[in-house]
Amino acid sequence: MIRNCRRDDLQMILHIYNDAIVNSTAVYHYEPVTLENRVAWYEEKKEQDCPIIVWVEDDVVMGFATFGPFRPWPAYHYTVEHSVYVHPGYRGKGIGNKLLKEIIRIAEARGMKTVIGGIDASNVTSIRAHEKVGFVHSGTIRNAGYKFGKWLDLSFYQLDLEGPASPTEG
């Protein structure tokens, strides 16, 4: 089931996130992060009123999703960039898809216009999952990162939502 993240979920989130760092190009980071890092991340998300949701079964966090500001400048305030991570032992069970759909629903409910996903161009599974729910490729930055002895291309996918009825510049 999906629910809002609680502080006591952070140890399991840490494990999922560090697996993505160490074993994939889903995160362009080299070293595992600490629990203190995830606590600071959690507090920052709360301060920014950004959601963190988790998929939990039998008190085990199997995946999580979040979004945050796409860029810090005010004219971007209707655009968010999201992340979805699933524990490797629970992939292929539809958890990522459910988390993705829920984070989109939350963005829509908050009046967002655009949801962005930055996806490593070689991550075909994630790209297909995003396309399946309506994301379209909006561009690729070639050689955006370097990890595991090779240059990485970062593809951006976007989903356009209805957005606010009366957008403002403030």
PLM regions with names:
Residues 1-13:
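A short beta-loop-alpha structural element at the N-terminal edge
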Residues 69, 116-119, 131, 136-153, ...:
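Conserved catalytic-core motifs of GNAT/GCN5-like acyltransferases
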Residues 33-89, 100-101, 160-162:
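Acetyl-CoA-dependent GNAT
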Residues 60-64, 125, 151:
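Glycine-rich acetyl-CoA-binding "A-motif" of GNAT/NAT acetyltransferases
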Residues 10, 14-43:
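Conserved GNAT-fold acetyl-CoA-binding loop/helix
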Residues 107-119:
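Conserved GNAT acetyl-CoA-binding A-motif
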Residues 163-170:
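Acidic/histidine-enriched, glycine/proline-rich intrinsically disordered or flexible terminal extensions
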Residues 86, 92-105, 124, 128-132:
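Conserved acetyl-CoA-binding loop-helix of GNAT-fold acetyltransferases
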